[in-house]
Every structure is written in structure tokens, then in C-alpha cells.
Amino acid sequence: DREALVDFLKALKARSGCEIYLEPGEAVALDAGILVGEILDVFDNGMPVGITDISATCHMPDVIEAPYRPAMLHERSDGPAIRLGGPSCLAGDIIGDYVLPDEPHIGQRIAFLDQAHYSMVKTNTFNGVPLPSIWLWNSENDMLRCVKSFDWTAFRDRLS
């Protein structure tokens, strides 16, 4: 009941004198946005490990803060898994274990689904890891347009 909520919030504001803001929540961006990255290195540590340019701690904080495993575009249901991690020095910068569509290799693109709700508002530049660029995809003509990209000055300016 929207009108009852509006009336309640107006009464609360009048009683408390506080400004009240409603955060829209993830519903406005649920199932929207993908986070695309690249495998930078592959090695064996008892299982295949891939270091990516995507950081769980910097770009996907729910992976660390909550029991959350983001879905990956074109992930296979079976086969040998690779543990994907980020480039920061944080020991827990682990995205998770995934079965990639191809043999893992340096330069391989990966894409995580449903990332708009946090990859834009909770990102950080811990350890100098850059913020992800924001691109728009036009599904009618398959064109990509860069809306915003970030460089070292974005890191510097967040500190001052």
C-alpha cells in the first residue's frame, strides 16, 4: 500500500525532523549488468588457479561478505574447475571455482552475470586495483559505448 507508506514516512519526518531517504535496493538492477574481465595468469597450486583483472574484494564484495557465488556466462556444468582470484595482495581475493567453456589460458575473457547492483556502488581501489569501466550495449545493433572509464587519477582523487 504505497499511500500508507507515504503517509507513514511523512508523519515520521514531522515527528523526528529528519530527512528520510528510501534506498531502492537491488530490485532496480537485479539481473542487470555483467562484469567482464580477463585471465592474467594461470598456474597449478594443487588445482588450476587463474589470476584475473577482476577482484572479489574490489569489484564483487558480496563474494567475500556473503555466501554468494556469481553466475558466469557460458560456464559448463562439468569438467575440471579452475579457482579464479583477483590481482590484489589480499589472501582472500578469491572469486570462486568455475568450469570454463575452454581450457583456461592467459588472455581468456570471462563474464560474471548480475553484477550491476554492486559492481557500480561498492567498488573500491584497494591495492591500486582500478575501478571497472562502465559500458552500454545496444542490443538492437550490437554496439558498445564506453560511458566512463577510470585511470590512476580516479584512484588518487578518491584519497584526497
Task: State the predicted function of each range.
Residues 1-24:
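Acidic, glycine-rich loop-and-beta core segments that form the ion-binding/anion-interacting portion
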